[in-house]
């Protein structure tokens, strides 16, 4: 997520709350548009300004929004996938800091262990990567994806190339 990579606070709103009209989608069926800000309060202010109906995006709901500001987290139990926080990766320090902050604010953190078979990651990755490959098809077919700086195994240009082999059946079943 972009906020994790730059150390800011991000809000990924529920699908249908903020227009995607004019945004460059990576995955048209899963993408959401939300603010990147200095704090949760700033995110709430920006979200309140950008939410709502747009004639160019028929997926939107006109639902109210209130943000109380100060919230007592001591009554919250927050589950997190422990295995996702065990590894050291490029932005793991931000993820681990989030857990420490939630605990400091009084939330009860509950590590959850699930088999990979129980997680929808595979289905989500098929959808995300197939739609991203379609969105960036012209970039891939013209070989301009080779101009992108990051070319490691899991970089987007390689995901675009590999996703061209996802069948329609796999995509629909995901």
Set out the residue ranges of the language-model regions.
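Beta-strand segments within the central parallel beta-sheet cores of soluble alpha/beta enzyme folds
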Residues: 59-62, 112-114, 152
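Short helix-loop capping/hinge segments that flank enzyme active sites or metal/cofactor-binding pockets
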Residues: 72-81, 126-174
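Acidic helix-start/capping segments at beta-turn-to-alpha-helix junctions
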Residues: 115-127
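Conserved strand-to-helix beginnings and helix N-cap segments that scaffold or border functional pockets
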Residues: 2, 89-92, 122
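FAD-binding core of FAD-dependent oxidoreductases
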Residues: 1-10
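Acyltransferase
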Residues: 90-115, 136-147, 171-173
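A short helix-breaking turn/cap at a secondary-structure junction
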Residues: 9-97, 142, 146
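Short, surface-exposed loop/helix-turn segments at secondary-structure junctions
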Residues: 60-61, 123, 173
């Amino acid at each position: 997520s972009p906020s994790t990579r730059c150390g800011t606070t991000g809000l990924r709103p529920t699908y249908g709350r903020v227009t995607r009209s004019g945004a460059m989608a990576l995955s048209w069926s899963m993408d959401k548009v939300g603010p990147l800000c200095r704090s949760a309060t700033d995110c709430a202010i920006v979200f309140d300004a950008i939410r709502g109906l747009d004639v160019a995006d028929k997926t939107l709901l006109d639902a109210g929004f209130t943000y109380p500001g100060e919230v007592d987290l001591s009554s919250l139990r927050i589950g997190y996938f422990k295995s996702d926080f065990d590894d050291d990766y490029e932005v793991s320090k931000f993820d681990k800091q989030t857990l420490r902050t939630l605990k400091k604010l009084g939330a009860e953190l509950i590590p959850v262990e699930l088999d990979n078979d129980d997680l929808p990651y595979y289905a989500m990755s098929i959808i995300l990567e197939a739609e991203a490959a379609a969105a960036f098809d012209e970039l891939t077919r013209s070989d301009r994806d080779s101009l992108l700086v990051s070319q490691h195994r899991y970089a987007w240009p390689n995901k675009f190339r590999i996703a061209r082999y996802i069948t329609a059946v796999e995509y629909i079943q995901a």
